[in-house]
């Protein structure tokens, strides 16, 4: 028997990164990790910078980095509207490492304004999310 699937669209302002049937989706919502399978209750939630892990039909996995956005779950359609989205294999590890170091340095020197600190914290979260995806791809 075939696994139950749902249609998923992952889009950003720049492009559509994925459109097709998936068995499951995992994202980082505003309240923590969230998994969506076929038959999930309708939902609308904010997404934090992180990984979209999707399991396509027949078990193939794909990883996409998003820098925040919105998740909408309808009975037969799941949509990820990302602020920015990049396929996992297109991420630049050296750039992510450099961004992580810069954000940590900015936070360590006690940013002069709270806004600077918050911006550095967001940059750090984005860099860590990118590095997590790169590590996941290495495990495959």
From Swiss-Prot:
GO terms for molecular function: ATP binding; proton-transporting ATP synthase activity, rotational mechanism. GO terms for cellular component: plasma membrane; proton-transporting ATP synthase complex. InterPro entries: ATP_F1_dsu/esu_C_sf, ATP_synth_F1_dsu/esu, ATP_synth_F1_dsu/esu_N, ATP_synth_F1_esu_C, ATPsynth_dsu/esu_N. It is a peripheral membrane protein. Disulfide bonds: none annotated. Keywords: ATP synthesis, Cell inner membrane, Cell membrane, CF(1), Hydrogen ion transport, Ion transport, Membrane, Transport. Produces ATP from ADP in the presence of a proton gradient across the membrane. F-type ATPases have 2 components, CF(1) - the catalytic core - and CF(0) - the membrane proton channel. CF(1) has five subunits: alpha(3), beta(3), gamma(1), delta(1), epsilon(1). CF(0) has three main subunits: a, b and c. This is ATP synthase epsilon chain. It comes from Pseudoalteromonas translucida (strain TAC 125).
């Amino acid at each position: 028997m075939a696994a139950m699937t749902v249609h998923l669209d992952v889009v950003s302002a720049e492009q559509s990164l994925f459109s097709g049937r998936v068995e499951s989706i995992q994202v980082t919502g505003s309240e923590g990790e969230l998994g969506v399978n076929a038959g999930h209750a309708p939902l609308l939630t904010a997404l934090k910078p992180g990984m979209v892990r999707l399991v396509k039909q027949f078990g193939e996995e794909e990883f996409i980095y998003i820098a925040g956005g919105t998740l909408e779950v309808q009975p037969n359609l799941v949509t990820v509207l990302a602020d920015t989205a990049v396929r996992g294999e297109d991420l630049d590890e050296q750039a992510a490492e450099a961004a992580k170091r810069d954000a940590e340095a900015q936070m360590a020197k006690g940013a002069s304004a709270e806004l600077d600190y918050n911006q550095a914290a967001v940059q750090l979260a984005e860099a860590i999310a990118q590095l997590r995806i790169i590590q996941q791809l290495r495990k495959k």
